[in-house]
Amino acid sequence: HIQAQKNEFFRPKEVWNDTEGNPINAHGGGILYHKGTYYWYGEYKVGKTVLPSDATWERYRTDVTGVSCYSSKDLLNWKFEGVALKAITDDPNSDIHPTQVLERPKVVYNKKTKKFVMWMHIDSPDYSKAEAGVAIADSPTGPFKYLDGFRPNGTMSRDQTVFVDDDGTAYQFSSSEENQTMHINRLTEDYTKPDGKYVRRFVGMAREAPAVFKHGNKYYMLSSGCTGWDPNSAELAVADSIMGEWTVLGDPCTGPDAEKTFYGQSTFVIPVQGKKNAFIACFDMWKKKDLQDSRYIWLPMMIDKQTNKITIPWHAEWNLDVFKKK
């Protein structure tokens, strides 16, 4: 067994191998930093991509196999930790049966319960179910136990993310109302359910693929438009409080193909530990006809010292030296 070549640079759109030399398979993913280690969770897409014969739009799919987990100290070299949440193959009625849809898994750590809580978009093959699913584990690498799927506060939930604020309160952001409006759902103290308080934001603006982060005293949401697997313009929005009013700032991407988000779609924003004002914007470059070979586009966010304006410039190759040390 030969140790694979170490990754020295981020190379967006290129095949990105794990420490064993296999392509990283963690799509629509999210990153958790816990006790000195980053954990990357994503859709584990294995096997042939098919277009169902009854499809009325390009809903290319692979069977659900589960949610993969990778670990890293440096964000560049990732060790495959296995499938942290496995599809339930012996119960055809399960939300996470191979015939169903499981997308955009995000894991947060609950300091009170000491549990790792995974939220995900679960759906029927025709995307009519529009629910959120929740699973929990005692360890970051799993195994995660699937708890339940539901419509948060009785409303549709498709593309989604979870954000934990500095005070320990968690929120689920989800594309609701036929993907036309973003719902921000506050969660219970154990992070496993909505607590009943929610707001409707970006009404009628059809934003998907939310990624939320905090910089200074402000909250930011990066999102995409709503064009299926095909790329569109990214958009950044800002708020003084999560449940407050959000202001659209426009497209932060710059460089070639910026108006198409470099052919990517947002999935997460990583705060880089030990660096000042350092965030990585993570995008998926979907290959709709071969979803397993969808690539990743990770790019550094640039924050202007004077104006606090955030841009995401294209880099074909970069490393963490672009950020200043704390």
Regions found by a protein language model. Name each.
Residues I2-K326:
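Carbohydrate-active catalytic/glycan-binding domains of CAZyme proteins
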